[in-house]
Amino acid sequence: MSLRHQITAVVLAAASSLCVAAEGRLSVHVLDQQTGTPAADVHVTLEARTDGTWHTIARGATDTDGRIKALLQADQPLAAGDYRVTFHTGDYFRVHNTATFFPEVPVVFHVQDAAQHYHIPLLLSPFGFSTYRGS
């Protein structure tokens, strides 16, 4: 990966952490570190854990900017508890004719304050990824 692509990925990641999606309680942003561009059309599943079992509560796909601004709509309840957002990355890489070691990236997180907005950026490459709690 060229230095220019690395710098672009870092700048995009920083920008994503500054953006708060007022439309929903949960947003995601996927950036392709190999190309330094947003990852469009990555399918994402959101699940909640109830009594030790995962239940799907929302699905979506990233837009041309690599974002889902409201994976969970503002009027949908977000209770305190454990959640899992799974980024289905295999199809994204397949469309781009790129082999990947990670066909999906599950991110488990805990909600303490249901009134807050939660943002989960994913920095993605074919053989690695990084995520964190954005704002």
Identify the meaning behind each predicted range.
Residues G52-L71:
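Short, acidic Ser/Thr/Gly-rich low-complexity loop/linker segments typical of extracellular
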Residues A21, T50-T53, D75-P77:
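Short, glycine- and charge-enriched coil/turn segments that flank and shape catalytic ligand pockets
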Residues S2-L3, A80-S135:
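Feature of secretome-associated and extracellular-like proteins
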Residues Q34, T50-G52, D91:
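Solvent-exposed strand-loop boundary residues in beta-sheet-rich modules
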Residues V42-L46:
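Hydrophobic beta-strand segments
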Residues K69-G81:
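Short Pro-Gly-centered beta-turn/loop motif in secreted/extracellular proteins
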Residues H5-A39, W54, S130-S135:
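Beta-strand-rich domain onsets/edges
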Residues A22, P38-A40, A79-G81, Q116:
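Short loop/turn segments at connectors of secondary-structure elements within structured domains
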